[in-house]
Amino acid sequence: MKIIVLVLLILGCSQLINSQEVPSDSILFQQFINWMDNYGIFYTSGDMQSKFKSWKSNVLEIASLNSNLNVPDVLYTVTETPVSNLRTLLDAEPTIVESYPGQDIQQFEVNQFSDLTASEFSNIYAGADASLAISEVAASTLSTGAIVGIAVGGSVALIGATAATVLIVKKKRQNKKPQVSEPIATTQDVKMKPTNGIDLLNRTENQHRSITARAFYS
């Protein structure tokens, strides 16, 4: 069973962004810890601050995008128990979130990739070259270059970037298919042994003749 969690943080961010105000880092960090617990994600002490910085940028970007929709809240779904720390591309599939069943509204949401930048996502899951610059499409969609909760339906550029990532991985996997060599047909001469034919009556020279087995018919 899934628990529907109301993220008041993003609601507050959406409203405060319009007034040029941002929640304090202490509030955001507490929400960051809650996000880690929900997805079963852990960091070393050396990575904690850098991951929080990326996550904070993503959350503020999500709030900015959702603030243009003029909706009051954002929902995201988590399981009762923490999920595996192993992240897969299947988790990036789009999910539609509706705040009110009577309204056809699609919103952005956080997911377990929300602590990654676009370059980190490409390097880890698409085998991209880290020396290459982020595409203009992705950069124009997210000013921070971040992978946000891919629960989209409104941003064509973000969906396109996600689809391109999947295609790159698929092509890379196809190139790694093992090459199977074709079998080589060979011929071999068969030596035929001479024979005098088949003795259908089985009349061998030393055939044993049993007296008790004979029968006389008049």
From Swiss-Prot:
The chain crosses the membrane at residues 147-167. It comes from the Eukaryota. Pfam families: Inhibitor_I29 (PF08246). InterPro entries: Papain-like_cys_pep_sf (IPR038765), Prot_inhib_I29 (IPR013201). Its main location: membrane. Residues 1-19 form the signal peptide. It is a single-pass type I membrane protein. Residues 20-146 are extracellular. Keywords: Membrane, Signal, Transmembrane, Transmembrane helix. GO terms for cellular component: membrane. Residues 168-218 are cytoplasmic. It is found in: Membrane. This is Uncharacterized protein DDB_G0286021.
